[in-house]
């Protein structure tokens, strides 16, 4: 009998396949994890931007959650695009009952710059979901939104990481420094430790779905029972290779390659 760890993503769609639950499921598969998905929003988007968003009904969202949790318990859960307070209020009770790692990707803006979350929902996210998370995975703009100040350098990143842990209560936070000048430096902050990864910047426009993919790999590794450090370390290596080997698709910010990384 073959055993596969199980990971669940709760997020929006991307018909072009580069981001959202499509990227998450590809990442789970690439890391030998059985993937499940609950759709929060139907998003018409591609490498050029977001064209239209329609949220699933509250009834459909609840039904999907019940379908999953009543039948196949996950070993790790990831949330991505949670666009409204209502969506978060429906999901939150399920997150509170989790007995497995919860990875919160605070998706607020698409790679194209399009806004993906209501203003009121940002407050709910910070006060009601962040305290439930095993790890949150903001990029610099998302971290700035959470902490309320600008981040210009690694020192600001460290200040932001410590503030997020203290004020909002997640168990850990990894802040991605891809938006800073210079090398790509990412920081992982836990209650006890601080770790940093640094790699040369890859000059490319093909970064669609990088945040989703990074968080999904962390989720997959945690579903396998890996430590936070091991999960983030693997995600960093995975996304670096995925960007390096991007398939040059689309007319805008193209997707990464979810198949290129091999252990």
Each predicted region: which residue ranges?
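Charged C-terminal helix
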Residues: 4, 55, 71, 229-263
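N-terminal basic/disordered segments at the start of proteins
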Residues: 17-33
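Acidic-glycine-rich active-site phosphate/pyrophosphate-binding loop
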Residues: 1-4, 9, 20, 182-197
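Phosphate-handling active-site elements
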Residues: 32-36, 195, 221-234
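Short pre-catalytic strand/loop immediately N-terminal to key active-site residues, enriched for Gly-Thr
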Residues: 10-16, 195-208
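Short, small-residue alpha-helix embedded
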Residues: 22, 145, 204-228
């Amino acid at each position: 009998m073959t055993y596969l760890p199980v990971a669940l993503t709760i997020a929006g769609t991307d018909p072009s396949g580069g981001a959202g639950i499509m990227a998450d499921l590809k990442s789970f598969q690439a890391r030998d994890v059985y993937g499940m998905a609950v759709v929060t929003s139907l998003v018409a988007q591609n490498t050029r931007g977001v064209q239209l968003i329609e949220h699933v009904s509250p009834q459909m969202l609840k039904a999907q959650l019940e379908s999953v949790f009543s039948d196949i318990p996950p070993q790790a859960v990831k949330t991505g695009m949670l666009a409204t307070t209502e969506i978060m209020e429906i999901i939150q009770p399920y997150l509170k009952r989790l007995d497995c790692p919860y990875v919160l990707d605070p998706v607020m803006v698409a790679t194209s710059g399009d806004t993906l979350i209501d203003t009121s929902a940002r407050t709910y996210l910070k006060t009601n979901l962040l305290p439930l998370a095993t790890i949150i995975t903001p990029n610099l703009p998302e971290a700035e939104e959470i902490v309320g100040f600008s981040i210009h350098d690694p020192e600001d990143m460290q200040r932001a990481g410590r503030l997020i842990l203290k004020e909002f209560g997640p168990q850990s936070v990894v802040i991605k420094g891809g938006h800073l000048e210079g090398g790509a430096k990412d920081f992982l902050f836990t209650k006890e430790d601080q770790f940093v990864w640094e790699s040369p910047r890859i000059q490319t426009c093909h970064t669609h779905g990088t945040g989703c993919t990074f968080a999904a790999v962390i989720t997959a590794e945690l579903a396998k029972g890996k430590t936070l450090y091991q999960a983030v370390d693997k995600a960093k290596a995975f996304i670096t290779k995925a960007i390096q080997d991007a398939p040059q698709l689309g007319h805008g910010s193209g997707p990464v390659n979810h198949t290129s990384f091999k252990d």
